[in-house]
From Swiss-Prot:
The gene coding this protein: MT-ND2
One biological process term in Gene Ontology: mitochondrial electron transport, NADH to ubiquinone
Protein name per its UniProtKB record: NADH-ubiquinone oxidoreductase chain 2
Free-text function comment from the UniProt entry: Core subunit of the mitochondrial membrane respiratory chain NADH dehydrogenase (Complex I) that is believed to belong to the minimal assembly required for catalysis. Complex I functions in the transfer of electrons from NADH to the respiratory chain. The immediate electron acceptor for the enzyme is believed to be ubiquinone.
Domain of life: Eukaryota
Pfam families per UniProt: NADH_dehy_S2_C, Proton_antipo_M
Membrane topology: Multi-pass membrane protein
Primary location group: mitochondrion
């Protein structure tokens, strides 16, 4: 890609997301979302492969459909209330449509099926952008309108996202698809308390980004595409695989790693709100994802069953150095639990 085009696209993505966090007008919010979508399409289709083109088309159609629904709901609310302010959206039907549209943008269940195929069709770093940065804008809008959002709708989507994220990842061998289902499950945890305790949801999203970024950077460094590729890396770089294993366990929410903090706070908040059934179902559904993380850890840090290698092992011909930022993020994914806030 031309360096000037790359600069314009990345600047547009960064500025559109930043402007959404600071605007209070629905038309401005919609315009920023459209700029963000149009800027992501060239990045997704950059590999110049039929799968990348298919992924870019799917992403564009889903995001445009969600933005159009949100604009329709905002217009309906403006006709009935004579205001375009995001935090003054009072029409129940408009609020519900906006919530569903934002759930579609975040790939929350039941609107999650597009994310794995889009993630598999593009590069590892572009997938990282879709799973982290692209969730900031819809999450910001949800946080702005959280006091008007239907709590039942949010909780149902959260429980369904955690369940579908775990079930979908059970039979996956491709790492990008597996991480996409992991993102769907984490989206459920982020949304679980967004109406009752938005600060906990913000903390959950922050921890999610801190665990996802080093995982993707390490996968990109080793150029692993499947779970089998991870198993062949152990003899070449045991330090990298050890750090990757700990980061994956942190994503699973195992104590005493940092990933345990948000789940602990969310379950504690739900129980304090007398939502014991919902908390129990979410905790049980998260065991599906935990099984997948344990399988990944076993494959990446211990052993592979005897097999014939039918593809060239990439680590034989490449030796990449790990940037300092990756090391710092991996340490944060393991050591932040003692700093848990009292929420």
């Amino acid at each position: 890609m031309n360096p000037m085009s790359w600069l314009i696209i990345t600047t547009s993505i960064a500025l559109s997301t930043t402007m959404i966090t600071s605007t209070t007008h629905w038309l401005m919010t919609w315009a920023c979302l459209e700029i963000n979508t149009l800027s992501m399409v060239p990045l997704i289709s950059k590999p110049n492969h039929p799968r990348a083109t298919e992924a870019a088309t799917k992403y564009y159609l889903i995001q445009t459909m969600a933005s159009t629904s949100m604009l329709f709901a905002a217009t309906t609310n403006a006709l009935n209330t004579s205001n375009w302010e995001t935090h003054l959206t009072t029409e129940p039907m408009a609020t519900t449509i906006i919530t569903l549209a934002l759930m579609m943008k975040m790939a929350a269940a039941p609107f999650h099926s597009w994310l794995p195929s889009v993630s598999q069709g593009t590069t590892t770093l572009t997938t990282l952008t879709i799973l982290t940065w692209q969730k900031i804008a819809p999450l910001t809008i949800l946080l702005t309108t959280h006091n008007k959002t239907n709590i039942t709708l949010i909780l149902l989507s959260a429980m369904l996202s955690i369940t579908m994220g775990g079930l979908g990842s059970l039979n996956q061998t491709q790492l990008r698809k597996l991480m996409a289902f992991s993102s769907i499950a984490h989206t459920g945890w982020i949304m679980a308390t967004i109406t009752m305790a938005p600060k906990i949801s913000t903390l959950t999203f922050t921890i999610y980004i801190m665990t996802t970024i080093p995982t993707f950077l390490l996968i990109n460094t080793t150029m692993s595409m499947t779970i089998k590729d991870l198993g062949t890396m152990w003899t070449n770089s045991p330090y990298t695989m050890t750090i990757l294993s700990m980061t994956i366990l942190s994503m699973g929410g195992l104590p005493p790693l940092s990933g345990f903090m948000p789940k602990w706070l969310i379950l504690n908040n739900l129980i304090s709100m007398n939502m014991i059934t919902e908390a129990t179902l979410m905790a049980m559904a998260s065991l599906l994802s935990l099984y997948v993380y344990m399988r990944l850890t076993y494959m990446s840090s211990m052993t592979l069953s005897p097999h014939t290698t039918t593809m060239p092992l990439k680590w034989r011909t490449s030796n990449k150095k790990h940037p300092m930022g990756t090391s710092m993020l991996t340490m944060m994914t393991m050591l932040l639990l003692p700093l848990s806030p009292n929420m």
